[in-house]
Amino acid sequence: GDLLITRAGPRNRTGVICVVDGEPENLILSDKTVRLSYLRNFVNPHYVMTALSSPAMQYFVVDAMTGMAASQVNISQEKMKTFFLPLPPLNEQQRIVDEVSKIFGRIDKLNF
């Protein structure tokens, strides 16, 4: 359940976050990727992924990007540490994740 965030690359692929469930064998992270470990008793990784992927949080992610060309931008780990993420109680985090998953499930049905 670790979180991975791209911290460098093309503008549209920087700041992308995912949850890695399990422990993949022979995984080596690029220096352009940040791994977030967290306190499992307080944080649902899927909630963090959902929250950081939201349009409101993406505003802060894009604002933290530096670089002259859209083909190569960066977000420093120091900037990432300044992101403010609302952190409701764990049961509320799970409720939000469940609700968002239901909505995405409905969207997937419409697309296929």
Question: Over which residues does each language-model region extend?
Answer:
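Short, ligand-facing micro-motifs at secondary-structure edges
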Residues: 3-29, 46, 50, 59-65, ...
